Amino acid sequence: MDRIVEIEKADFEEEIETSLRPTSFDDYIGQSKIKENLKVFIAAAKKRAECLDHVLFYGPPGLGKTTLAHIIANEMGVSIKITAAPMIEKSGDLAAILTNLEENDVLFIDEIHRLSSAIEEVLYSAMEDFRLDIIIGSGPAAQTIKIDIPKFTLIGATTRAGMISAPLRDRFGMQFRLNFYTSDELAKIVQIAAVKLNKECEKNAALQIAKRSRGTPRIALRLLKRIRDFAEVNNENIINENRAKSSLDALGVNDLGFDEMDLKYLEILGSTKNRALGLSTISAALSEDEGTIEDVIEPYLLANGYIERTAKGRIITAKSCEILGIKYKMTQKGLFDEDQ
């Protein structure tokens, strides 16, 4: 099901997202602690004339992991090569990428948790010793060829840090979790992006967009672009609060950033009242795969207290019951009483 608040990036958005992407830490809104630490580490690496240590970014999709990788490369004054783990199928694929890097370049691997164990084995020596150990042949006749490669910085990005093997994770000298953005931060991002899209967006309008963006810049920018379309058709050069509200309502995004899929998810949990639901059950009810539910739908709901995840499954909270108009009553066991 296509969703206007879908966090995953579609191919057609790549070009316009690049044009809206900040190119320096000074232009990057949010994630203040991460920015300040990275500034120090980059300055130290440049002072020593070394490549930056390897970096792992993790957290929900759409929060700026790729953007930060680009900024790191810009601040270091080096090139960045971008790939995704599913595209690295054989050790030869990785070898081709690494041998084509220049000294101190940045290699960005998205979805790094999806690397196979065989590829990880090759990556270990590359990360630690800047050397490739390639095994040729098999059995007693197998030989290991050692190839020196340029020193480089690996930046890995993942939405599932728990799925990264411990040996790979431990080789990242810097590990940062990206958090959801505040409404004020998102409003600033929206207003800056609106100017780049040749529109003026009033502050109250930007806040309306921010409130419905699930703490995620990618969603905020997608909503802004759709609202711009409504304004364009109505010959409006300025996006005001009324335009933002009416457009968002037309798009089916409510004041909490929920769309039909979120509400259906909560209604499924609310209908059980006195028992938790497992992921497979929710997946079947929503006709969505489990990975999409875990990576896209649930993070925002969990972070904001709309659901809880227990050993027995997912349960609805009082906060969500109030939204749905469902009676919430806890038993001594900590579950919900059924209406009598």
Curated annotation (Swiss-Prot):
GO terms for cellular component: cytoplasm; Holliday junction resolvase complex. Its main location: cytoplasm. Residues 1-181 are annotated as: Large ATPase domain (RuvB-L). The keyword S-adenosyl-L-methionine does not apply. It is an enzyme of class 3 (hydrolase). DNA binds at residues 309, 314. It comes from the Bacteria. Mg(2+) binds at residue 66. It is found in: Cytoplasm. Keywords: ATP-binding, Cytoplasm, DNA damage, DNA recombination, DNA repair, DNA-binding, Hydrolase, Nucleotide-binding. It catalyses: ATP + H2O = ADP + phosphate + H(+). One of its GO terms (biological process) is DNA repair. ATP binds at residues 20-21, 62, 65-67, 128-130, 171, 181, 218. Residues 182-252 are annotated as: Small ATPAse domain (RuvB-S). Coiled coil: none annotated. One of its GO terms (molecular function) is four-way junction helicase activity. The keyword RNA-binding does not apply. Its EC number is 3.6.4.-. HAMAP family: DNA_HJ_migration_RuvB. Homohexamer. Forms an RuvA(8)-RuvB(12)-Holliday junction (HJ) complex. HJ DNA is sandwiched between 2 RuvA tetramers; dsDNA enters through RuvA and exits via RuvB. An RuvB hexamer assembles on each DNA strand where it exits the tetramer. Each RuvB hexamer is contacted by two RuvA subunits (via domain III) on 2 adjacent RuvB subunits; this complex drives branch migration. In the full resolvosome a probable DNA-RuvA(4)-RuvB(12)-RuvC(2) complex forms which resolves the HJ. Has 3 domains, the large (RuvB-L) and small ATPase (RuvB-S) domains and the C-terminal head (RuvB-H) domain. The head domain binds DNA, while the ATPase domains jointly bind ATP, ADP or are empty depending on the state of the subunit in the translocation cycle. During a single DNA translocation step the structure of each domain remains the same, but their relative positions change. Belongs to the RuvB family. This is Holliday junction branch migration complex subunit RuvB. It comes from Campylobacter hominis (strain ATCC BAA-381 / DSM 21671 / CCUG 45161 / LMG 19568 / NCTC 13146 / CH001A).
